[in-house]
């Protein structure tokens, strides 16, 4: 009888836990995805802060030339970064217990792999948590779909690209200058500026910014006056009010006359779908572009594509970009190899008389 009572109490405790985890009445919704999200993001954040402050230099290129990234080793907020895991480790799973010592783990950049893998798992769970909360509230799932764009972008630069290149040392460093270095080297090796998917991503980000500014300014300019001239127009809105807060007909008429009639949305729902979809699709394409260039399906190459009637090359902007790429590649990992890969790929002339 005692055993039965204990089992019922155990089930009751588990049931209360399940109800608490999935309750939409909590100040912050946890959810089943949150059970995994909270420890992974806390781990990634904690290790990032500690490593950014105090991690010793990392042998990123695997040539016994450690690179310093932490504040205590001479960096500032701009130059500091979590240095990627060493090329000597490659794509191997490298937890602390796989190293002979903590010093070896730090020297080979173990914190980078720990942070990145926990971070990617955490943000994926955050996306799942968005869907879970939407489902429990009876909402549509598009918030999680929109968030999938930055999740895809982060996964591309932190996981897919290192897999394609064969080493976590090619992943994006976790810092400001490290991000810029990653971008410059990516351009040098993959000509990303000439990749159509990157162009779509640029159109998505800048177009999304433009459309957001246009929408916000149109709404703000066509608010329905509910206050006196001595009060802020914002005071005329009450949270949860049923009445429209701005005149969409006036905004539609203004924009239709500013450009042309059919450039303006007359349906608020389709307008807001467009505002969400444009940047999301653009960032999806960018993530897809990074993922294809990870396996060296690079941007367009129009080098020396214009010649005169005598066969002499007429330089274009493509040739200018190509020369810049070679210059950046020469400066990249200059102690790891003597020549950039593009130049070293040419077969050496024969020396046999």
Curated annotation (Swiss-Prot):
E.C. designation(s): 1.10.3.9
Topological type in the membrane: Multi-pass membrane protein
Residues where chlorophyll a PD1 binds: 198
One MF annotation (Gene Ontology) recorded for this entry: iron ion binding
InterPro entries in the cross-refs: D1/D2, Photo_II_D1/D2_sf, Photo_RC_L/M, Photo_RC_L/M_CS, PSII_D1
Binding site for [CaMn4O5] cluster: 170, 189, 332-333, 342, 344
Calcium listed as a keyword: yes
Enzyme class: oxidoreductase
Binding residues annotated for a quinone, in chain numbering: 215, 264-265
GO terms (BP aspect): photosynthetic electron transport in photosystem II; response to herbicide
Keyword Nuclease: no
Residue(s) at site: Stabilizes free radical intermediate: 190
Domain of life assignment: Eukaryota
Catalytic function, reaction form: 2 a plastoquinone + 4 hnu + 2 H2O = 2 a plastoquinol + O2
Modified positions (Phosphothreonine) in chain numbering: 2
Annotated cofactor note: The D1/D2 heterodimer binds P680, chlorophylls that are the primary electron donor of PSII, and subsequent electron acceptors. It shares a non-heme iron and each subunit binds pheophytin, quinone, additional chlorophylls, carotenoids and lipids. D1 provides most of the ligands for the Mn4-Ca-O5 cluster of the oxygen-evolving complex (OEC). There is also a Cl(-1) ion associated with D1 and D2, which is required for oxygen evolution. The PSII complex binds additional chlorophylls, carotenoids and specific lipids.
Positions of chlorophyll a ChlzD1 binding: 118
Site label Cleavage, positions: 344-345
Known partners and oligomeric status: PSII is composed of 1 copy each of membrane proteins PsbA, PsbB, PsbC, PsbD, PsbE, PsbF, PsbH, PsbI, PsbJ, PsbK, PsbL, PsbM, PsbT, PsbX, PsbY, PsbZ, Psb30/Ycf12, at least 3 peripheral proteins of the oxygen-evolving complex and a large number of cofactors. It forms dimeric complexes.
Its job: This is one of the two reaction center proteins of photosystem II.
Note: 2 of the reaction center chlorophylls (ChlD1 and ChlD2) are entirely coordinated by water.
Cited NCBIfam families: psbA
Protein name: Photosystem II protein D1
Taxonomic path: Eukaryota, Viridiplantae, Streptophyta, Embryophyta, Tracheophyta
Name of the gene encoding the protein in the UniProt record: psbA
